[in-house]
Amino acid sequence: FVRATGLRRRELTRLRVGDIFHHHQGQIVVQVQCGKGGKQREAPVLPGYEPQILALIEGRPPEALVFPRLPGRRLHDLRRDYAQSLYLCSAALASPSHRAELPPVTGRLKRADYDLTAVQQVSWALGHNRIDVIFKHYLRS
């Protein structure tokens, strides 16, 4: 679920079935009611994960917790996977004629190597306001 949505542990523990829905554009999104800093946001579900997400909530009441208990596993690596996949999807949508890929990490990261609109979308989906956090912690290999 984290790889598909990028949610933090605390956000997962508060997530209700009714917080997962089809966006007006047809994409499945997760409405984070109280994210980092008490902020609300929408996290898009990555393409290909929709059937598993919908199966997880099917037939359950909207007020039910999606995850009554969580395993003790570290989630940051899964959030990084989500961020990188969302970046690639967003960059590919912005420029369908060119194949999006993460720039190689050799030495210092250069912002010019990235699609900044896609980076901003990743930042919003993860609940960050600063794209430098995304560059430093999520888009590196």
Which residue ranges define each predicted feature?
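Short functional hotspots where side chains directly engage DNA or cofactors
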Residues: 27-33, 99-141
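Residue-level marker of regulatory loop/turn positions in helix-turn-helix DNA-binding domains and
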Residues: 1, 71, 75-76, 111-115
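A short, glycine-centered helix-capping/turn motif at helix boundaries
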Residues: 1-14, 85, 89-94, 116, ...
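A structural signal for short, well-ordered beta-strand segments and their strand-loop junctions
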Residues: 11-14, 66-67, 134
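C-terminal catalytic core of Y-nucleophile DNA break-rejoin enzymes
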Residues: 35-55, 63-82
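Short, basic/aromatic-rich helical patch in the C-terminal catalytic core of site-specific tyrosine
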Residues: 12, 76-91, 105-106, 122-123
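Conserved tyrosine-mediated DNA breakage-rejoining catalytic core shared by Y-recombinases
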Residues: 10, 14-51
